[in-house]
Amino acid sequence: MELKNGRPGDLSGRFSREIKVYDLLDDLGIEYMTVDHRGAPAETMEACKAVDEVLGTVMCKNLFLCNRQQTVFYLLLMPADKPFKTKELSAQINSARLSFAGPEQMEQYLDIRPGAVSLMGLMNDTENHVNLLVDEDLLSEEWLGCHPCVNTSSLKLRTKDAFGPFLGAVHHTMTPVHLVGEP
């Protein structure tokens, strides 16, 4: 795996959802780096660890959640080494107990499949069905690693660009949360 500036040189055989991410970042003038791992999709946290070492970023856990009634959806970004406690997060956002949303909603709202959940999917949520929650520990990092809506490539971009110009362009806001991962 090799880290390269900007979009991959060869876009043949790539999904349109991936190319759409590069197009938006380029249009916004956001600098980013990519690494391809097409032969080894980052489907597990173990696989992501190897990619994040190449990216030089903190490994991020991206969880697609919903309330019990499946009427409110959340994308939670948090450090991978923190345990996720639904009760802790539910209390902070004043929501009924949260659970993992299904792949159908993930594809419907973010145009992403399981294993590729990413902040970049918010560009496809044009009606703002998904609320972005970000653990404050990630906000203090200089760099953020994420998928370009597929798990066969990864991006490295400045955290300030991800939560500034990118979020503004896709008409989303972020709610910082403080997670400690304790019962």
Segments (PLM) and residue ranges:
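Extended, low-hydrophobicity, polar/charged segments
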Residues: M1-P183
